[in-house]
């Protein structure tokens, strides 16, 4: 079962010819995942700023966020991000992300047991954003990724560049993000692997007469065919029409804020996950996601449940806090 979870993780973090640094594309935010994933246009979620740094804004001054994703009893993802302001330079963030695969039993070439070993990915990141003209913000960040599997390790560095247009009067946001432009410093082998570069575009719009916001996210636009390295059978490959390959790039989601209070109900749909992970003639929810968020005066809680496959469901939790609210006479948003 743990192998299945790892396989699913590799497939949906895959967008280059390399899987060695697929962790660069891991999405940890409960808000984003409940809206279908790859969301880059939600300006009130600090967790999204690790890739789309242009989403940083003054409402996030002295804010902190923790994200936790459980794929199984042993495979867990954790992230932390902090944001604040540099008055002359704009906003900045700093954080860490970790994917723990757990412990594995080692075997030699003859099938005899050796020592247990551990596998994990660890990423450090920092970024800065600044409004360059009215409503348009530029964001830049750097990431350092270290992977350790048994006695093998790999190291890579990459950068992300993003632009966000936020028209508050029209309640409309557009973002474009070029992710993972970098190089391998050290690899598991002598072969130099490619960093999985990704181009994303997103938009969101809040309706004027209904407390509802819809999200459209387009991912991996640098390459048309992202049908993936794994095909269940030749019949599945034959079914890969041009239209279906186009929809592989699309995630959609919606957020309802009932009575305009502090409760948020979310749902999303991931076309690629639906097409590639569903089993024919068997009812299932692969590709669908949902979640709920509750906002308090000084912190908010978010939860998402994602159906990856008929036998795999992920639970994601996010906690975001305004640290200034816990300091007497501190600066509040």
Language-model features: locations:
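Sec/Tat signal peptide C-region and signal peptidase I cleavage site
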Residues: 14-18
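Sec-dependent N-terminal signal peptides
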Residues: 3-13
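Subset of outer-membrane beta-barrel
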Residues: 19-333
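Positively charged n-region of N-terminal signal peptides that target proteins for export
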Residues: 1-4, 134
């Amino acid at each position: 079962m743990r192998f299945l979870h790892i396989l699913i993780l590799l497939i949906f973090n895959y967008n280059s010819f390399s899987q060695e640094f697929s962790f660069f594309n891991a999405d940890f935010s409960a808000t984003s995942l409940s809206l279908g994933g790859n969301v880059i246009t939600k300006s009130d979620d600090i967790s999204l700023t690790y890739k789309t740094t242009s989403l940083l804004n003054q409402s996030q001054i002295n804010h902190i966020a923790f994200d936790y994703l459980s794929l199984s009893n042993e495979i867990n993802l954790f992230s932390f991000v902090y944001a604040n302001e540099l008055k002359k330079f704009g906003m900045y963030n700093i954080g860490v992300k970790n994917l723990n695969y757990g412990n594995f039993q080692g075997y030699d070439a003859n099938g005899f047991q050796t020592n247990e070993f551990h596998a994990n990915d660890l990423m450090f990141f920092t970024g800065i954003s600044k409004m360059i003209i009215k409503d348009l913000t530029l964001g830049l960040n750097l990431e350092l990724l270290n992977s350790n599997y048994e006695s093998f390790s790999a190291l890579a560095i990459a950068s992300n560049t993003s632009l966000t247009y936020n028209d508050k009067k029209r309640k409309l946001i557009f973002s474009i993000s070029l992710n993972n432009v970098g190089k391998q410093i050290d690899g598991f082998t002598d072969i130099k692997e490619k960093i999985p570069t990704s181009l994303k575009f997103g938009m969101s719009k809040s309706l004027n007469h209904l407390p509802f916001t819809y999200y459209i996210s387009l991912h991996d636009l640098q390459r048309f065919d992202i049908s993936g390295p794994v095909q269940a059978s030749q019949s599945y490959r034959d079914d890969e029409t041009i239209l279906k390959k186009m929809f592989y790039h699309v995630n959609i989601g919606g957020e309802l804020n009932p009575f305009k209070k502090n409760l948020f109900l979310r749902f999303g749909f991931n076309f690629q996950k639906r097409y590639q992970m569903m089993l024919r003639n068997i009812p299932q929810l692969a590709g669908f996601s949902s979640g709920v968020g509750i906002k308090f005066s000084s912190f908010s809680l978010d939860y998402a449940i994602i159906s990856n496959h008929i036998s795999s469901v992920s639970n994601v939790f996010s906690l975001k806090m305004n640290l200034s609210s816990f300091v007497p006479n501190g600066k509040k948003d």
